[in-house]
Swiss-Prot record:
Record's bilayer topology term: Single-pass membrane protein
Pfam families the record matches: ATP-synt_B (PF00430)
Recorded name of the encoding gene: atpF
Protein name, entry field: ATP synthase subunit b
PANTHER family given in the database record: ATP SYNTHASE SUBUNIT B, ATP SYNTHASE SUBUNIT B', CHLOROPLASTIC
Length: 156
């Protein structure tokens, strides 16, 4: 292998190429690689922030859901208590009204019983007077008296 001037010229051209590449080609490539690395790092940091924010938001949502469930349960319990109170009040009113109706019916039945007794007394008195008149008009006879008493029984 012979070393001649072309080898030195090729070495110089190679050095010029390396210097040119280091001066003009390598900085934009290095800059692009650095920018890409920075974007990747920023993306990872943003993903971490988003993940932590997501965890915080999920916790807040769970807290709000638990609060809402508790409020809903308490409102439902209040509504059930109110409904039960209204039902009890309606039952009490209905019982009271029923008692009034029963008392009125008993009073009316008692009044009708008294009126019926009065009517019966008047009829019995009239029949007794009528029977006494008939007995006094006729002669005193045990058979006739028994017959009259039997007729009076059937009329009563």
């Amino acid at each position: 292998m012979s070393i001649n001037a072309t080898l030195f010229v090729q070495a110089i051209v190679f050095l010029i190429l390396v210097l040119f590449t280091m001066k003009f080609v390598w900085p934009p490539i290095a800059k692009a690689l650095d920018e890409r690395a920075q974007k990747i790092a920023e993306g990872l940091a943003a993903a971490d922030r988003a993940k932590s924010e997501l965890v915080a938001v999920n916790q807040r949502v769970e807290t709000e859901l638990a609060q809402t469930r508790n409020e809903t349960a308490s409102r439902l319990a209040d509504a059930e208590r109110r409904a039960q109170a209204i039902i009890e009040e309606a039952k009490a009113r209905a019982t009271e009204e029923g008692n009034k109706i029963v008392a009125a019916a008993r009073a009316e039945a008692e009044q009708q019983t008294i009126q019926a007794r009065e009517a019966l007394r008047e009829q019995v008195a009239a029949l007794a007077v009528k029977g006494a008149e008939q007995i006094l008009r006729k002669e005193v006879n045990a058979g006739v008296h028994a017959d009259l008493l039997n007729r009076l029984k059937t009329e009563l």
